[in-house]
C-alpha cells in the first residue's frame, strides 16, 4: 500500500511538473505570440512611417513642381506683360522687318513726289527757283502767291502733289507740315483745305504708326527708352478712355506729334483708336492754320494766328477731351 501511495505521489508530482512545464511552454508561446504581434505592429508602423515619408516627399515634390510651374507661369506672364507694355499685342507680334526696307519705302515715296513734279504745270524759270518746301512763314507767303496762279488751271495735280508731300512729311516725321497747313488755306480755301489737311495729316500719322510697328519698333525702343516708359505709365492710367486721351495729346503740346506716332504702336494703342483720336485732335489747330492761310498775305507774324482767344479755345477743347477720364476717376474714388 505504501508503495502504491508513493507511486501515486510520484505520478502526481510528475503531472504537476508536466503541468508546470506546459504552463511555462504556454507562457513562452504567449510571449512569442505577443512578440510576433509587436513585431508585426512595428513593421506596420514602420511601413506607415515610410509611406508617410514617401507621401511627404511626393507632396513636397508636387509642391515644388507646382511652385516651379507657378514661377514659370509668373515669369511668362511678366515677360508677356513686359512685352505688352512695349508692343502692340506682343504675343502675336511678328519679327520686325529689316531696316533696309525703310530705305526702300523712303526711296519709293521720293520717286512718287519727283514724278508728280515732272508732271507739274510748266513754270517760269524764276518761279521754278522758288518752288521748295517752306521753312518759314515768309516762304509760305511766297509759295502761296506763286502756286495760286497755277491752281485754277491745274487743280488736280496741285492738290494731289500737296496731299502726297504732306503725307510724306508726316509719315517720316520730317518738319514742315505746319507750313503746308497754312498754304492749304491760300490754295484751296477753308471748305477744301480744312478736311484735306485733317485727312492727309491723319493718313501720314497712320503710315508713321505702321512703319514704326513693322520696321522700326526696335530702333524706337533703343532711341527713346525713357520717353517710352513715361508715355507707357501715362497710358496705363487712361486705358478706359484711351480715345479721349489721344485727342487730348493731339490738342495739347505735352508730347510732340512725331513721338506719339512712333510710340503708340509699341504701347498697345489700337490703330483705329489712334487714327480717330488723331483726326479729331488735330482739328482745332488745323482749322486755325487753314483759316489763317486764307488771309496769309495780311499776316505779318505767325504769332498773330494763335492769339489769346485761340489759345483759350484750344485749352477748353483739351479740357473737354479729357473730361470723361476725370469724371470716371472721380466716380471710382467715391
From Swiss-Prot:
GO terms for cellular component: endoplasmic reticulum membrane. It holds the Pfam family VTT_dom. The keyword Transmembrane helix applies. Residues 47-79 are annotated as: Disordered. It is found in: Membrane. Keywords: Glycoprotein, Membrane, Transmembrane, Transmembrane helix. GO terms for biological process: autophagosome assembly. The keyword Membrane applies. The chain crosses the membrane at residues 97-117, 156-176, 192-214, 246-266, 269-289, 305-325. Belongs to the TMEM41 family. This is Transmembrane protein 41 homolog. It comes from Dictyostelium discoideum. The lineage of its organism: Eukaryota, Amoebozoa, Evosea, Eumycetozoa, Dictyostelia.
Amino acid at each position: 500500500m505504501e508503495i502504491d501511495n508513493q507511486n501515486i505521489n510520484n505520478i502526481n508530482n510528475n503531472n504537476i511538473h508536466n503541468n508546470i512545464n506546459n504552463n511555462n511552454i504556454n507562457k513562452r508561446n504567449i510571449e512569442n505570440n505577443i512578440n510576433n504581434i509587436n513585431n508585426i505592429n512595428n513593421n506596420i508602423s514602420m511601413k506607415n512611417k515610410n509611406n508617410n515619408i514617401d507621401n511627404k516627399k511626393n507632396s513636397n515634390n508636387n509642391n515644388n513642381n507646382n511652385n516651379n510651374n507657378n514661377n514659370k507661369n509668373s515669369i511668362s506672364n511678366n515677360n508677356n506683360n513686359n512685352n505688352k507694355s512695349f508692343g502692340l499685342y506682343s504675343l502675336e507680334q511678328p519679327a520686325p522687318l529689316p531696316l533696309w526696307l525703310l530705305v526702300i519705302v523712303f526711296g519709293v515715296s521720293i520717286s512718287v513726289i519727283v514724278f508728280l513734279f515732272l508732271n507739274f504745270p510748266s513754270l517760269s524759270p524764276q518761279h521754278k527757283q522758288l518752288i521748295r518746301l517752306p521753312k518759314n512763314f515768309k516762304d509760305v507767303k511766297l509759295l502761296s502767291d506763286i502756286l495760286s496762279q497755277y491752281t485754277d488751271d491745274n487743280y488736280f495735280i496741285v492738290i494731289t502733289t500737296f496731299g502726297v508731300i504732306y503725307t510724306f512729311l508726316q509719315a517720316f516725321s520730317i518738319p514742315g507740315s505746319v507750313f503746308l497747313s497754312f498754304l492749304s488755306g491760300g490754295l484751296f480755301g477753308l471748305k477744301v483745305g480744312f478736311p484735306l489737311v485733317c485727312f492727309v495729316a491723319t493718313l501720314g500719322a497712320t503710315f508713321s504708326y505702321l512703319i514704326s510697328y513693322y520696321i522700326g519698333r526696335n530702333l524706337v525702343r533703343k532711341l527713346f527708352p525713357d520717353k517710352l516708359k513715361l508715355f507707357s505709365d501715362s497710358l496705363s492710367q487712361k486705358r478706359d478712355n484711351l480715345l479721349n486721351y489721344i485727342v487730348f495729346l493731339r490738342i495739347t503740346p505735352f508730347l510732340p506729334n512725331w513721338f506719339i506716332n512712333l510710340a503708340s504702336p509699341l504701347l498697345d494703342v489700337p490703330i483705329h483708336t489712334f487714327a480717330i483720336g488723331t483726326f479729331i485732335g488735330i482739328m482745332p489747330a488745323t482749322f486755325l492754320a487753314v483759316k489763317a492761310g486764307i488771309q496769309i498775305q495780311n499776316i505779318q507774324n505767325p504769332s498773330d494766328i494763335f492769339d489769346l482767344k485761340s489759345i483759350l479755345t484750344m485749352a477748353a477743347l483739351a479740357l473737354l477731351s479729357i473730361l470723361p477720364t476725370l469724371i470716371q476717376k472721380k466716380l471710382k474714388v467715391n
